[in-house]
């Protein structure tokens, strides 16, 4: 797992689905990260609102009791990925940013979100470029 020293602190990076697994957060805690960044891509227009498809063939972590289809993809990203696991890393804050737009013919979905030890906040789902800040 990559950790980069920045002026704001030690930044841990989890790419997309890596953010769904608790062992990655334990590893980042061992590297004493202060911040997390999760670049992500959710395939298909409107996928955020559709039923969650589960862990797509990977072993489901022991702390996940939900089964595929029991919540939306968006709710799953908010509970079982970085926003729901940031406390396991020791980081003060984190951000998940979804690539949006048309990649080949796949379309995309997702709401970027910012999290800290107290909870998380979704970014608006407006179209176009944006800047998302977390004041530390």
Where is each model-derived feature located?
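A short, polar/charged loop-to-alpha-helix boundary motif
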Residues: 1, 129-136
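Extracellular structured ligand-interaction cores
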Residues: 1, 16, 109
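Beta-strand-turn-beta hairpins that frame and shape the catalytic cleft
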Residues: 2-12, 35
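Hydrophobic, structured segments
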Residues: 12-14, 58
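CN hydrolase (nitrilase-like) catalytic-core segments centered on the catalytic cysteine
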Residues: 19-132
């Amino acid at each position: 797992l990559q950790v980069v020293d920045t002026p704001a602190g030690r930044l841990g990076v989890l790419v997309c689905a890596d953010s769904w697994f608790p062992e990655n957060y334990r590893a980042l805690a061992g590297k004493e990260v202060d911040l997390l960044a999760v670049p992500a891509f959710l395939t298909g227009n409107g996928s955020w609102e559709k039923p969650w498809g589960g862990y797509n063939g990977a072993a489901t972590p022991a702390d996940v009791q939900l089964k595929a289809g029991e919540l939306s993809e968006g709710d799953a990203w908010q509970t079982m990925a970085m926003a729901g696991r940031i406390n396991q890393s020791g980081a003060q804050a984190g951000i998940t940013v979804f690539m949006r737009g048309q990649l080949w013919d796949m379309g995309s979905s997702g709401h970027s979100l910012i999290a800290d030890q107290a909870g998380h906040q979704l970014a608006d789902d407006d179209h176009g470029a944006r800047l998302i800040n977390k004041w530390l």
